[in-house]
Structures are given as structure tokens and as C-alpha cells.
């Protein structure tokens, strides 16, 4: 993005020259306004903040679109905006230039895809100890296809024979994910897919940020290729997306903790749908391997939030469904609150005293408040932690024993782990001072991170054995 891109565009029905470098877009009008005119027009005005997509043409004749920009005035008609993403059309010499609209499919490349969909699958045999056993099936490579909400997600491998001075390089192979849309998509739709797919690969790699090396959208258009008006041919037009990535150390290439598509046991669609929900939390994932080796209060609180969120989705009404007496008491309280609300509402309808009505309305409001609280109470954090540590013991026990050994602890009960986590969470949440992390708090933190994955994968209908394989690979 550090390269300079210049060109022309129209914004608010006005022609501008643009200068784009270092993620900053500057619009220069054909004629600069005088200082007095600009000062009087903008004096005391609060500029409206709106985010738009602005299209133009580069000085090399390519289509360009600056995505989700909000302009501010710099004076004399000059505008400036930060650009979080932009799109370059890969075709010129076409009139008019094709725009990034009515998109039919996207294709994505990246290291996370190479790890997830192993490109060496194009080798039919990997018994390299026997001469002549390595055969390449490059001519009949099959893709793995999945239908998600009527869109076809296709995993495949691209290969080519590179023109390289290195005579030892025979094939260049890259895995890709292609999504064929049932309905044509616009730029904002594509961005939504981009964010969801990144979220899925964050889950797969247990990393907060994931990069793609290439993100291309494409569509097919009809072109008249010569002077004969009937000579119409179809041409595929590509649009490459470029995104501003966070300034964080991303070390996915060094990570050995990842899983393959085959590990999901044909549950890709279910997992994708669940982990790309808006309510699915990924903020607690580590930034890198080094970030994964320490814990702080912020991480601790995010793990607590993610755990409770996943637990409530995986096991709704946990205590009510497992404790008959608790369920009876809860229903009795809710029935009483409902009865009192109805009683007060009826009294409001029959009463003419405005002061009395206001008082009754406040009482009804408080009843509604307590009703909401009682409905949401279904087991404490400590109870939920103990339940998960017991439920997923076969999966987490090896990790638990390793942590106990590392911290020179002979034995520790689930109740002690749960209480330590709960107490630390409460101190942080209520703004109370906290000491350095104890060994027990760190162990409970590490085990709960695994439990979150277990809850999610169980929601995706994976069996315990499949969950165990995935957990061992990620953690």
C-alpha cells in the first residue's frame, strides 16, 4: 500500500484528481477554492460523518474503488480520508470500465488455507522410500464442495510450473477457497463474506488475526471484441481486494497448532455457520505464539465472557434442566411476578389518580426488571466451570496433568479451580485490585480456553473422539 496511486474520480458530482499512498486518500479539485470562501462556508459547521465507497480510474486506466471512507475537509476544496480497504480492477482497455458489482464468486489464497487444505494432496502416493511411487494427479484434481445458505464453498489446489532460475522447483502449488454465489453480490456483501471467512480461520488456528495473501472477486461480462457487432464473447473480469491489516506480529507460519479440513469429519458447514455468528466471541484468541504464553487481566476477562457465552448457547437452562427443585422454585418465582404484574396493570386501568398510576407503573417496571434477572439466572459461573471440567475430563485431562506437573502441584480438585477462576473474574469485573496470578488461576484459565472450544464443537454435533483430535492439534 506504500506505492503511490493517482487518478481521477467523481465525488458529490464534482471531478477530483486523487493521490493515494500510505492508506491515505487525498482529493484535489480541478480549481482550488479561495481561503475566504472556504472559511465562511465551513465556519462553525459540524461535518457529517458518513462512510461511503468511492469509485474512480487510475492513471494506468484501471478501475479503483476506495471502500468505507469518510472525508474531512482540509481547506480550499481539498478532501482527505483514511482508506481501510480498496479494490483494483484487473482489466483495462475496456470501455466502459467494468465496476465491482454483480459479483459471481470470490477466490481466496493464504497460508492459513495451505495449512487447512494441505496442497500436497495432489501427490497420489507419499511412499518416497520406493522409487517411482510419487505420482501427481494434477490433471484430475478434485475439489471439496460444501453448500452453505445456497452458496457453494469449494476447496481446491492451484498448480503451475513456475518460470524460475531455481531448477529444483518443479511445481508451485497453492490451496484456495472459492465461493460461488447463488445471488449476485455487491461490495458490502463481499466485505461481509471476507470478515466471516477470516473469523472462521481465526477459530481454526486459535489466532485473533488472520491474513490472506490474495482476495479476488470476479464476474463474467459480454464483450464485443471487434467491429462485427455480432461477435460477442464472454470474458472473466477480476477485482482484487486490498485490506489494511492490524499492526500486530502474525506468526502463523511458525505455528504447528492447526487442523486439516479432514479433521472436521464433514462438519465444515455446521462449524462455519456457528463460528461466524455475530454473537460468537473471538477476542480472547492470542495474537501470536509469544502472546499465547502469558495471561493478563484483560485476557482473563475475555475468556470468562467467551466461556459463559458459549456455555449458555450450548447448554441453555443448564440448572433448570438438571435440578428439579431449582426448576420448581424458579417457575414459582416467575409465576408470582407475572401474577403481580397483571394485578398492578389491571389496577392502573381502573385508577384515575395520576400519582397512584405513576407509582403502580414504577412497581410494574421493577417487577419486569426482576423477572428478567430471574429468567437469566440458571447456574453460577463456578457451577458451570465444574460441570465443564467434569464433562470434558477425557479431553482435557492430559493438558491438566501437564499443567499440574509444570507448577509442581500434586493434585487439584475441579471445585478449587472453578472457585479460583470465579474469584479472579469478580475482582477484575468490580475494579478491585488484583495481585499476580496464582498457579491455580493460570491452570483454570488454560483449561477454560479448551472448554470453550469443546462447547463450540459439541454445538456443531461433533462426537467426543473428533473433538479430542481437534483439541490436541490446536492446544
Question: What positions do the PLM features span?
Answer:
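Amphipathic, oligomerization/interface secondary-structure segments
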Residues: 247-475
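Phosphate-binding glycine-rich loops and adjacent basic patches that engage nucleotide phosphates
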Residues: 148-164, 226-234, 242-249, 261-272, ...
Amino acid at each position: 500500500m506504500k506505492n503511490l496511486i493517482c487518478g481521477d474520480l467523481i465525488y458529490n458530482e464534482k471531478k477530483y484528481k486523487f493521490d493515494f499512498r500510505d492508506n491515505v486518500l487525498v482529493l484535489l479539485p480541478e480549481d482550488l477554492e479561495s481561503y475566504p470562501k472556504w472559511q465562511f462556508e465551513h465556519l462553525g459547521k459540524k461535518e457529517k460523518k458518513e462512510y461511503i465507497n468511492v469509485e474512480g480510474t487510475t492513471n494506468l486506466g484501471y478501475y479503483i474503488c476506495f471502500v468505507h471512507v469518510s472525508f474531512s475537509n482540509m481547506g480550499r476544496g481539498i478532501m482527505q480520508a483514511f482508506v481501510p480497504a480498496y479494490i483494483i480492477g484487473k482489466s483495462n482497455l475496456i470501455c466502459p470500465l467494468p465496476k465491482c458489482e454483480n459479483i459471481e464468486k470470490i477466490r481466496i489464497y493464504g497460508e492459513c488455507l495451505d495449512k487447512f487444505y494441505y496442497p500436497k494432496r495432489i501427490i497420489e502416493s507419499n511412499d518416497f522410500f520406493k522409487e517411482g511411487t510419487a505420482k501427481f494427479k494434477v490433471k484430475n484434481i478434485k475439489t471439496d464442495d460444501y453448500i452453505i445458505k445456497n452458496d457453494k464453498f469449494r476447496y481446491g489446489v492451484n498448480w503451475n510450473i513456475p518460470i524460475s532460475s531455481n531448477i529444483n522447483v518443479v511445481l508451485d502449488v497453492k490451496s484456495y477457497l472459492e465461493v460461488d454465489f447463488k445471488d449476485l453480490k455487491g461490495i458490502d456483501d463481499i466485505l461481509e463474506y471476507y470478515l466471516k471467512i477470516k473469523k472462521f480461520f481465526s477459530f481454526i488456528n486459535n489466532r485473533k488475526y488472520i491474513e490472506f495473501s490474495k482476495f479476488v472477486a470476479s464476474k463474467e461480462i459480454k464483450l464485443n471484441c471487434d467491429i462485427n457487432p455480432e461477435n460477442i464473447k464472454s470474458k472473466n473480469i477480476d477485482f482484487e481486494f486490498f485490506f489494511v491489516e492490524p499492526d500486530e506480529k502474525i506468526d502463523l507460519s511458525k505455528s504447528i497448532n492447526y487442523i486439516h479440513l479432514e479433521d472436521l469429519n464433514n462438519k465444515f458447514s455446521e462449524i462455519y455457520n456457528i463460528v461466524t455468528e455475530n454473537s460468537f466471541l473471538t477476542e480472547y484468541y492470542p495474537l501470536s505464539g509469544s502472546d499465547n504464553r502469558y495471561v493478563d487481566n484483560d485476557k482473563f476477562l475475555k475468556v470468562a465472557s467467551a466461556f459463559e457465552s458459549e456455555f449458555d448457547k450450548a447448554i441453555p437452562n443448564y440448572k433448570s434442566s438438571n435440578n428439579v427443585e431449582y426448576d420448581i422454585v424458579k417457575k414459582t418465582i416467575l409465576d408470582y411476578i407475572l401474577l403481580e404484574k397483571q394485578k398492578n396493570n389491571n389496577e392502573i386501568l381502573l385508577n384515575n389518580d395520576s400519582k397512584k398510576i405513576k407509582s403502580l407503573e414504577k412497581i410494574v417496571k421493577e417487577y419486569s426488571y426482576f423477572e428478567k434477572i430471574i429468567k437469566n439466572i440458571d447456574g453460577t459461573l463456578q457451577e458451570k466451570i465444574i460441570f465443564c471440567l467434569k464433562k470434558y475430563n477425557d479431553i482435557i485431562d492430559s493438558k491438566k496433568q501437564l499443567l499440574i506437573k509444570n507448577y509442581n502441584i500434586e493434585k487439584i480438585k475441579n471445585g478449587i479451580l472453578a472457585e479460583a477462576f470465579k474469584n479472579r473474574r469478580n475482582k477484575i469485573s468490580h475494579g478491585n485490585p488484583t495481585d499476580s496470578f496464582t498457579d491455580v488461576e493460570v491452570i483454570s484459565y488454560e483449561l477454560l480456553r479448551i472448554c470453550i472450544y469443546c462447547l463450540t464443537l459439541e454445538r456443531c454435533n461433533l462426537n467426543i473422539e473428533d473433538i479430542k483430535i481437534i483439541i490436541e492439534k490446536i492446544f
